[in-house]
Design a protein with these regions (language model features):
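Acyl-CoA/ACP chain-elongation machinery
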Residues: 5-41, 45, 74-88, 117-125, ...
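Charged helix-capping and loop-helix junction motifs
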Residues: 127-131
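Alpha-helix capping/termination and helix-coil
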Residues: 98, 102-106, 114-117, 121, ...
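Condensing-enzyme catalytic core mediating Claisen C-C bond formation in acyl metabolism
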Residues: 32-107, 111-112
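Alpha-helical metal-binding/catalytic segments enriched in His/Glu/Asp
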Residues: 1, 54-62, 161-165
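Short acidic capping loops at alpha-helix termini that bridge into adjacent secondary structure
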Residues: 2, 108-112, 138-139
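Short, conserved catalytic or adaptor-binding loops enriched in Gly and charged residues
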Residues: 62-63, 133-136
C-alpha cells in the first residue's frame, strides 16, 4: 500500500523574523480588527502578518471509502526572479502552475480558489492578475485564510488544504469578512 504523511509547520514569530519583514516594509502596522488585509486591493500599505501553524495529511493512492478529498491534478512552475522576494507583476509562474494543474485534471470547472495572497500590495496584485489571466470571465470564487492567522510560511499550503477540505465537506464557502463577495456562491462546491 502506498501512503505518505505530508504536511507543513512553521513558527516564525521570532524577533529576528519580525525584524526582517519590517525591514522589507511588508509587515502590517494597521490598528484594525483584521490587520492582514489579504486580497484587499484598496489597501495603501503592505499588511502582512506572521502566524504560527501546522497541518498534516495522509495521502493514499487510489479511491478510498473514507477519503476526505481527491487530488485530481497538479501543477508547478518557476520563474526568473530579480530579487529573493520578487514576483513578476502578472504572476507568470502562478499562471503556468494553475494552467498545468487544470490541464492535468482534465480542465474541470473550478468553484473556489484559495489564494496564497499574503497581504502585500505587489504580491496580492500579481496573484490576482495571474488568476484573471487564467480564468478570465470564468473566475471562480476567491478566498484566503491569512486574515485569521497571518502568513505561516511553511504551514500555509497545509492550512489551505485543510480549508479546502472543510469547505468541500460542509459545502460552505468561507468568505473574507472585510471584502464584498461579488460572485454568487454555488449551491454545491465540487472542485
Amino acid at each position: 500500500e502506498e501512503r505518505f504523511l505530508v504536511g507543513g509547520t512553521e513558527a516564525p514569530l521570532t524577533p529576528f523574523t519580525i525584524a526582517q519583514v519590517k525591514a522589507l516594509k511588508i509587515y502590517s502596522s494597521l490598528p484594525l480588527p483584521y490587520p492582514c488585509r489579504s486580497m484587499d486591493m484598496t489597501k495603501k500599505q503592505n499588511t502582512m502578518v506572521l502566524g504560527e501553524g501546522a497541518g498534516c495529511f495522509c495521502l493514499e493512492k487510489g479511491e478510498r471509502p473514507n477519503a476526505l478529498a481527491y487530488i485530481i491534478g497538479i501543477g508547478f512552475a518557476t520563474e526568473q526572479l530579480t530579487h529573493s522576494v520578487s514576483l513578476s507583476p502578472d504572476g507568470q509562474c502562478l499562471q503556468e502552475s494553475m494552467r498545468s494543474a487544470l490541464e492535468s485534471a482534465g480542465n474541470p470547472k473550478i468553484d473556489v480558489v484559495i489564494t496564497h495572497c499574503t497581504g502585500t500590495i505587489k504580491g496580492d496584485r500579481a496573484e490576482l492578475n495571474a488568476i484573471e489571466a487564467v480564468f478570465g470571465a470564468q473566475k471562480p470564487l476567491l478566498t484566503n485564510n491569512k486574515w485569521q492567522h497571518g502568513h505561516t510560511y511553511g504551514a500555509s499550503g497545509a492550512l489551505n488544504l485543510g480549508m479546502a477540505i472543510e469547505m468541500l465537506q460542509s459545502n460552505t464557502f468561507q468568505p473574507i469578512p472585510y471584502l464584498d463577495e461579488a460572485n454568487e456562491v454555488p449551491e454545491k462546491l465540487q472542485t
